[in-house]
Amino acid sequence: AACILLFPRFLLTAVMLWLLDFLCIRKKMLTMPTAEEAAGAGEGPPPDDPPVCVSDSNRMFTLESLKAVWHGQKLDFFKSAHVGSPAPNPEVIQLDGQKRLRILDFARGKRPLILNFGSCTUPPFMARLRSFRRLAADFVDIADFLLVYIEEAHPSDGWVSSDAAYSIPKHQCLQDRLRAAQLMREGAPDCPLAVDTMDNASSAAYGAYFERLYVIQEEKVMYQGGRGPEGYKISELRTWLDQYKTRLQSPGAVVIQV
């Protein structure tokens, strides 16, 4: 029954991937920044969600890409995390000291806990990691932040992307995942980082593959970002945190959740 419900969305995504292999369509749908825009990028703060660039050499419609899409959509369908529901509390491994903890162990009192799931081979995630660091610095006084390293989005022995920051094969053991997470640590040295277990318990509970954002507060899911790449938006999370901060400062204010 689940397969029947999932198939229309999967088929639509498959057709989209097939169309994106035609470069004329790809160039229209995935716009690249112009030279003028790139030159003016240094003026003012950079955007929270820089555009995702897909090189012409990348094949979008392959057996491996279809496997990855099906896997991600299946995890999203069966996830247990939903806005307003109790937050799943799977086991993770803290990168520092390799101590086994649970997601909610990183929460502190009534402060929101921001979860950012992703991997080093996910171009949108890595492109927005700097934005996430800025966000964490802006709201460190009211919220806590946790990066969770999950299975690779574009492993070198799977759906390969030439735009990936690193060439990393599928994790065969926990040490593989911990080594990959060390690379992410280099890009976000000031943010707590944990890795998913080898049975991908966190990714499954939160439907996190390819990448995803969540806000947990008092053991409840308060915000659930869309599935990456298209639904992965740091700007949307910033809006939620801005509204939350306004509510803290003005208890009578009306807050519209994103």
Curated annotation (Swiss-Prot):
Q: Where in the cell is it found?
A: Cell membrane; Endosome membrane
Q: Which InterPro entries match?
A: Iodothyronine_deiodinase (IPR000643), Iodothyronine_deiodinase_AS (IPR008261), Iodothyronine_deiodinase_I/III (IPR027252), Thioredoxin-like_sf (IPR036249)
Taking the first listed entry, what is the main subcellular location of this protein, grouped into a coarse class?
membrane
Entry's PROSITE patterns? T4_DEIODINASE
Q: What is the lineage of its organism?
A: Eukaryota, Metazoa, Chordata, Craniata, Vertebrata
Q: What Pfam families does the entry give?
A: T4_deiodinase (PF00837)
Which parts of the chain are coiled coil?
A: none
Residues in the Extracellular compartment per record = 21-258
Catalytic activity field: 3,3',5'-triiodo-L-thyronine + iodide + A + H(+) = L-thyroxine + AH2; 3,3'-diiodo-L-thyronine + iodide + A + H(+) = 3,3',5-triiodo-L-thyronine + AH2; 3-iodo-L-thyronine + iodide + A + H(+) = 3,5-diiodo-L-thyronine + AH2; L-thyronine + iodide + A + H(+) = 3-iodo-L-thyronine + AH2
Function statement = Plays a crucial role in the metabolism of thyroid hormones (TH) and has specific roles in TH activation and inactivation by deiodination. Catalyzes the deiodination of L-thyroxine (T4) to 3,3',5'-triiodothyronine (rT3) and 3,5,3'-triiodothyronine (T3) to 3,3'-diiodothyronine (3,3'-T2) via inner-ring deiodination (IRD). Catalyzes the deiodination of rT3 to 3',5'-diiodothyronine (3',5'-T2), 3,3'-T2 to 3'-monoiodothyronine (3'-T1) and 3,5-diiodothyronine (3,5-T2) to 3-monoiodothyronine (3-T1) via IRD. Catalyzes the deiodination of 3-T1 to L-thyronine (T0) via outer-ring deiodination (ORD).
Give the transmembrane region(s): 1-20
Q: Which organism is it from?
A: Gallus gallus (Chicken)
Query: Keywords, A to Z?
Result: Cell membrane, Endosome, Membrane, Oxidoreductase, Selenocysteine, Signal-anchor, Thyroid hormones biosynthesis, Transmembrane, Transmembrane helix
Q: How does it assemble?
A: Monomer. Homodimer. May undergo minor heretodimerization with DIO1 and DIO2.
> Per the UniProt entry, what are the Gene Ontology biological process annotations, in alphabetical order?
hormone biosynthetic process; thyroid hormone catabolic process; thyroid hormone metabolic process
In its UniProt entry, what is this protein called?
A: Thyroxine 5-deiodinase
- Enzyme Commission no: 1.21.99.3
User: Catalytic site residues?
Assistant: 122
Which gene name does the record give? Answer: DIO3
Enzyme class per UniProt: oxidoreductase
Q: Where is the signal peptide?
A: none
